[in-house]
């Protein structure tokens, strides 16, 4: 017969100690520090901050260390910590047009005001393992350059000529939704959709964005502009009556320029898709911009026929913490449910063999 296995508090405590032992690894190898994770695994830190909805490099590095490099577990840890923090208010919207740019490219124009700035990128590497990294040592110092001049957004250039739709503006008096405080409901406004996409699993968004390029809700995208750098964050101090700078954060912004749109009353123009994420997160912001544009199908009176255009499908399945919890709950005891299924199956098999006039096979579990 089936016997339920009971772990108990002692077994769980032993499992936690074993986890700590495995996390530390070989004691003869130096323990990795939080600054090492933050500085040398910076893209992983950026993803944890973005999908954890908390800009704190040290905390993200700690979460990665505690999670043994499992980024989804690290995101879960960061979100759990975030839930304990007090809310002092909302900052002013950041102005990415004033960004101190470290990287900025456009696939729509070769020559743009401010120029193309490659910055730190894997794009032109050969994707070959570098054995010199295993030996350690300092890399060659990067070339120095003059401070970058002003860089207007490519979409602003198109907008001056009326070639792209105006950036959709929210009602200034309307409250901004908050997915972390209120349950998701449909249909969702764009502010909630963008919040959801910013917190969404990068792999999920990448797959959906890829699906749009393969014809499932195709919107014929161009990477109008991708920029990465520092922007200043300001908080409106009501007592002082003006915005107070809090510091600077690193952001990646992607503006997708998409297929023409027009009607009997409106001239054809390009449409937009938007992505924004903490740190250097180009793959995430590009995928986000592709999916954002697809989710605007209802707004733009387009036929909804692809998964990436279905906001309920996308937004209900994009959260990796929620998805992990639902999938991994299958590891928890389901003894009663299984016994019920097992009893029903045995009854059905007995009826089947009785009707067939055959002897049932002896149950191996007995």
Q: How should these model regions be labeled?
A:
Residues 1-224, 242, 358-366:
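Short, amphipathic alpha-helical interaction segments embedded in low-complexity terminal/linker regions
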Residues 142-366:
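Acidic, serine/proline-rich low-complexity intrinsically disordered regions
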């Amino acid at each position: 017969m089936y016997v339920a296995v009971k772990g108990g508090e002692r077994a769980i405590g032993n499992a936690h100690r074993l986890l700590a032992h495995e996390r530390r690894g070989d004691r003869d190898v130096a323990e990795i520090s939080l600054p090492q994770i933050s500085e040398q695994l910076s893209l992983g830190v950026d993803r944890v901050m973005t999908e954890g909805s908390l800009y704190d490099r040290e905390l993200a590095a700690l979460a990665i260390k505690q999670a043994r490099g499992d980024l989804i577990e690290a995101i879960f840890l960061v979100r759990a910590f975030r839930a304990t923090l007090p809310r002092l208010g909302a900052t002013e919207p950041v102005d990415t047009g004033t960004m101190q740019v470290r990287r900025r490219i456009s696939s729509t124009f070769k020559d743009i005001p401010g120029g193309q700035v490659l910055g730190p990128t894997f794009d032109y590497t050969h994707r070959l393992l570098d054995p010199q990294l295993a030996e350690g040592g300092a890399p060659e110092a990067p070339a120095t350059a003059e401070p970058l001049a002003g860089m207007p957004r490519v979409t602003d250039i198109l907008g001056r000529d009326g070639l792209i739709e105006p950036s959709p503006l929210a009602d200034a008096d309307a409250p901004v939704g908050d997915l972390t405080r209120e349950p998701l409901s449909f249909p969702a406004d764009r502010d909630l959709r963008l919040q959801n996409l910013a917190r969404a699993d990068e792999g999920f968004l990448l797959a959906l964005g890829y699906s749009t390029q393969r014809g499932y809700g195709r919107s014929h995208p161009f990477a109008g502009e991708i920029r990465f750098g520092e922007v200043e964050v300001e908080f409106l101090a009501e007592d002082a009556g003006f915005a107070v700078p809090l510091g600077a954060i690193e952001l990646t912004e992607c503006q997708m320029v998409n297929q023409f749109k027009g009607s009997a009353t409106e001239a054809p123009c390009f449409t937009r898709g938007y992505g924004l994420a903490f740190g250097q997160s180009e793959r995430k912001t590009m995928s986000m911009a592709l999916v954002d544009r697809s989710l605007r199908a209802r707004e733009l009176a387009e036929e909804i026929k692809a998964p990436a255009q279905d906001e309920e499908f996308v937004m209900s399945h994009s959260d990796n913490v929620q998805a992990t919890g639902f999938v991994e709950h299958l590891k928890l005891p389901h003894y009663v449910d299984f016994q019920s299924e097992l009893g029903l199956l045995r009854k059905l098999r007995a009826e089947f063999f009785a009707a067939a006039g055959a002897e049932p096979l002896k149950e191996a579990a007995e």
